[in-house]
Amino acid sequence: MARPLPILGGILLSFSPPAEATVQYSIIPEPSRTELKQETAKTLQLLSDQEVPTLGTDAYRLTVTPQGAHLASGGREGRIYGLATLRQLLDQLAGQPEGIPCGIITDKPRYPWRGLMVDPARHFIPAADLKKFVDMMAYYKFNRLHLHLTDNQGWRLPVPGYPKLKSVASRREESFGDGIPHEGMYTKQELKELVAYCAARGIEVIPEIDMPGHNQALHAAYPEFFCFPKPDMNVRTTAGNSKELVCPQKPEVWKFYASVFNELKDIFPSGIVHLGGDEAPTELWEKCPLCREARTRAAMKDEQEQMKAFFEKTAALLAKNGQTPQFWYEGNAGIYHPGETVYAWRQDQALQSIEKTKKAGLNLIMASSEYCYLDFPQIQGQRNWGWMKTTTLQKCYDLDPAFGKPEKEAGHIRGVHAPVWAERLPDLNHLLYRAYPRACAIAEAGWSPMGVRSWENFRRKLADHRQF
């Protein structure tokens, strides 16, 4: 007996399609293999739904006949993806009463990791809105939702024993001088419900607790965690970073992070904790008497060795819980350990990151900002911080996560990841407007083999998805 189709979202796009006469499937991301038949199907009733383990856990085969559809899947993930394809065909059929071609779709993802990141730290996203965002992700076969829960502008994770995270760190006076207070924090129950909602749609949730920097909101709540406490510190109201890093020589810092990781373990079953690790200026560590004494005692030559020691201690805390770390890759491979996973994000450094991480024995997720940062302007004239490149839909589509490298040089690449940073995205509508349709291009970059990808065909499909 086939189970009901999951409830998934639609999308509104705006652009002109290329001229195209032949009726084809409009599936995004493009399947690995499609065989079209001469017959036409005017119904897509699911006639059979079978598990065929030999296909592979995340693979499926969907056969469209004049009488209806037959789904074979290798496992739970493959079934979810097959149903997502069937949902897209149902939407296509709704706009084509004359029918769609019969055929056989044999499909599996190119990469195991296909993620989007949202940024509730900068602008809080209510849990109900996150679920709407997740529906869109499932429609396009994304399988990782990355929650950037903490930053200079807000802290969104409740931690027992630390009430000022809610009363202080989750609130700011305004955003960019607008005079409007902003606040928000998830409850533990909301996050657990989100995890379950995502799991039902084949999506794993990855929490991020940024450290040792990007912590001005934490400093406002608990200044004693920092090298030079500033009791008058406020949660940041603009974009940008601060110089404040948590002090690794203070026991209360490690007690706090142990509590944070315990809470994450109870909420997020993935066991993965993204630790940030990016944009952490060490000048205050250099000046801090406690840090200087620790470097002398351990014969550390500089603050970068102290950074390595910081993350070694953090990783040890995680290991006690059976958790594993991930990081934004900063190019210094010496900070990370073989087998760990990093995200290549820095602009114009993708090839360099592929080569360095391969030599260091690291797993790499491609999130290169000039292709994958969906908060970047889509067209000239949209809001720009000055350093952002205009990232058009075609630029996103042009991404090959391996950059043409053979398997022996790029086999450590686990997939693709597109962040949607939210300094200027105050609500779900703004978030979706920035993310789509470019997220559709990222979905295809992560799922479809290069040999079946075509920009012109992608444009044709998007025109149909506008009607969905």
Regions found by a protein language model. Give the residues of each.
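Bacterial N-terminal signal peptides
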Residues: 6-14
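Contiguous, structured surface segment used for ligand recognition
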Residues: 19-111, 419, 430, 446-468
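Conserved, mostly hydrophobic/aromatic
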Residues: 75, 116, 137, 205, ...
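An acidic-aromatic substrate-binding cleft motif
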Residues: 102-125, 132, 138-140
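Aromatic- and acidic-residue-enriched carbohydrate-binding clefts of CAZyme catalytic domains
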Residues: 109, 153-200, 215-255, 283-305
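Catalytic domains of carbohydrate-active enzymes, especially glycoside hydrolases
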Residues: 131-152
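Active-site neighborhood of glycoside hydrolase catalytic domains
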Residues: 236-237, 242-339, 347-350, 354
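Flexible, acidic glycine-rich loops studded with aromatic residues
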Residues: 325-330, 335-340, 344-468
